[in-house]
Amino acid sequence: MTSFSLPAFSRLSPRIARAEREHHQLQAYFRLHRQDVERGDWGALSAVSLGVHNVYNGLEDILISLARDVDGAIPLGPTMHQDILDQMAAEISGIRPALLDEPLYEALTELKGFRHLVRHKYGFDLHPERVVENVLRLDGAFPQVIKAVVWLHGLLSTPAP
């Protein structure tokens, strides 16, 4: 489990562990059922799409925790899901540098859009190629988010010269 010494990061260890477990389960299922997904099997498409949805929720939960406990402000309202990504991609002067670089921000924005589709379309618009594309996108983005969080913790843990 990833552990942190700063109080502002204290909620993250169990959140990261939960998201990692979900991501590993998704990867294992996808390895076994990728051909079913590519063929358009409804059960496999639904299971894998929901897995991407759930892992993205875990990543968003981590970002919301950082917004609350490091930045001191959580976006609210109908655009909060995009706003949290915007906030994490921006430097907060005197508090922290940008957490998300442009490619990671774009990947998370795409995953957020896919999550919205899964959540609100009930599987009717799940196309096999989009599902595979988003599993692969998540496989790239997930470790980058965790690495960025660990990097930020290290940066904020280091006393200023």
Where in the sequence are the language-model features?
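Solvent-exposed interaction patches of small proteins and small membrane subunits
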Residues: 1-161
